[in-house]
From Swiss-Prot:
The keyword Transmembrane helix applies. Residues 217-218 are annotated as: Interactions with TJP1, TJP2 and TJP3. GO terms for molecular function: identical protein binding; structural molecule activity. This is Claudin-5. Residues 1-7, 103-122, 181-218 are cytoplasmic. Disulfide bonds: none annotated. The chain crosses the membrane at residues 8-28, 82-102, 123-143, 160-180. Its main location: other. One of its GO terms (biological process) is positive regulation of gene expression. Belongs to the claudin family.
Length: 218
């Protein structure tokens, strides 16, 4: 696969992963009510996210409430907010860096510098995926630990929500896309012909006898 194809495929994966990360950040489904034992039949289900909590009635009616106070939130929610938003903003910056270093753009002159810019974009997407993976795994670990904690009442136990799975898929796409971008940039650095240089050859001059030198025909 050529370097241009790697860049395009990597950028598409990163854009899809970026969209998934934004979706996971905004969805109020990081943890959902766990139905255990006598709690199987219930009139409502509770969803909790980074920005709001929602209560879904058995009739299908849903009521959401945005968190009023930041200081009243738990440590993991505050950290997840900061890290997830940072990852989303970093992906936005990485998009412009990647486009500047792409072979199909003229923001940077073709050559090793352009390949290094593209490589920087790939590294930023990799770091973005890792940055988003930290709050997802941290939050999931807390939910699982409280789920198996016998001291936590059954009514307060939660399960992993859909937003966590969407976030994990998004981070996977970001990291795979970042790897492809890095590979495409690495191919460019090892192949000077991809910078499309213009080369001129000096005209051959005949010898004193009027004939061209024999070495020109070897």
């Amino acid at each position: 696969m050529g370097s241009a194809a790697l860049e395009i495929l990597g950028l598409v994966l990163c854009l899809v992963g970026w969209g998934g990360l934004i979706l996971a950040c905004g969805l109020p489904m990081w943890q959902v009510t766990a139905f255990l034992d006598h709690n199987i039949v219930t009139a409502q289900t509770t969803w909790k996210g980074l920005w709001m909590s929602c209560v879904v009635q058995s009739t299908g009616h849903m009521q959401c409430k945005v968190y009023d106070s930041v200081l009243a939130l738990s440590t993991e929610v505050q950290a997840a907010r900061a890290l997830t938003v940072s990852a989303v903003l970093l992906a936005f910056v990485a998009l412009f860096v990647t486009l500047a270093g792409a072979q199909c753009t003229t923001c940077v002159a073709p050559g090793p510098a352009k390949a290094r810019v593209a490589l920087t974009g790939g590294v930023l997407y990799l770091f973005c995926g890792l940055l988003a993976l930290v709050p997802l795994c941290w939050f999931a670990n807390i939910v699982v630990r409280e789920f198996y904690d016998p001291s936590v009442p059954v009514s307060q136990k939660y399960e992993l929500g859909a937003a966590l799975y969407i976030g994990w898929a998004a981070t996977a796409l970001l990291m795979v896309g970042g790897c492809l971008l890095c590979c495409g940039a690495w191919v460019c650095t090892g192949r000077p012909d991809l910078s499309f240089p213009v080369k001129y050859s000096a005209p051959r001059r005949p010898t004193a006898t009027g004939d061209y030198d024999k070495k020109n025909y070897v």
